[in-house]
Regions:
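Terminal helix/beta-alpha structural elements that buttress the NAD(P)+-binding lobe
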Residues: 1-191
Length: 191
């Protein structure tokens, strides 16, 4: 299960799961569900649960998607705003969950659950060799087309567009997109 599958990290985790032929994949997403839909294979049981319907509906949707099976693995690309609690309600007591926000205490899980936290900073220390191999694999994925970056959008006005971009992110008017600000498009830049 991938919670936050339309986020950048969630989308990348989803693509790696698909490439590894892991199915069924239960995803949780919202307004950007159409982005997630591009990667999943419903014929293999993959599905999307819409978090905008509320926590109770998410938990119910997860249980329905499991159809009596145990949820043994979860990747929480959100790690806040109810995702932790929702996962705790459906994850098997012998399961494992990985979070992406370090330094938090994740409560509500039995001691038998394997709780881990991962982030890209891990490859700068003891996992340098893994980071090198992994980045090469993702580069190959981009070249071969099985791995795709988040959609990008150039915000007009260069650095003058940063406030508008941040406002859009804060207000939730944009999702599943990465903003690009071209410094050279900033009025007065280079003069």
């Amino acid at each position: 299960m991938i919670y936050g599958a339309s986020s950048a990290v969630g989308s990348y985790a989803l693509q790696l799961a698909v490439k590894s032929n892991i199915h069924p994949i239960i995803t949780v997403a919202g307004r950007a569900s159409s982005h997630v839909e591009k990667f999943i294979d419903r014929s293999k049981g993959d599905t999307i649960i819409d978090y905008r319907n509320g926590d109770e509906a998410v938990v119910k949707g997860l249980k329905e998607a499991l159809n009596g099976a145990k949820l043994m693995h979860a990747f929480d690309a959100v790690s806040e705003k109810g995702s932790v609690e929702n996962i705790a309600q459906v994850l098997d007591s012998q399961g494992a969950v990985t979070f992406v926000l370090p330094g938090k205490e994740y409560k509500g899980f039995p001691e038998s659950v394997n709780l881990t936290c991962t982030n890209v900073g891990d490859v700068h220390n003891s996992l340098k060799d893994f980071g090198y191999v992994h980045s090469r694999s993702l580069t190959r994925g981009l070249e071969e087309g099985w791995f795709k970056a988040q959609p990008q959008e150039v915000v007009p006005g260069g650095l003058e567009g940063v406030a508008k971009g941040l406002s859009n992110l804060k207000d939730g008017t944009v999702s599943a997109v990465k903003y690009i600000f071209k410094v050279e498009d900033t009025p007065g830049a280079g003069q």
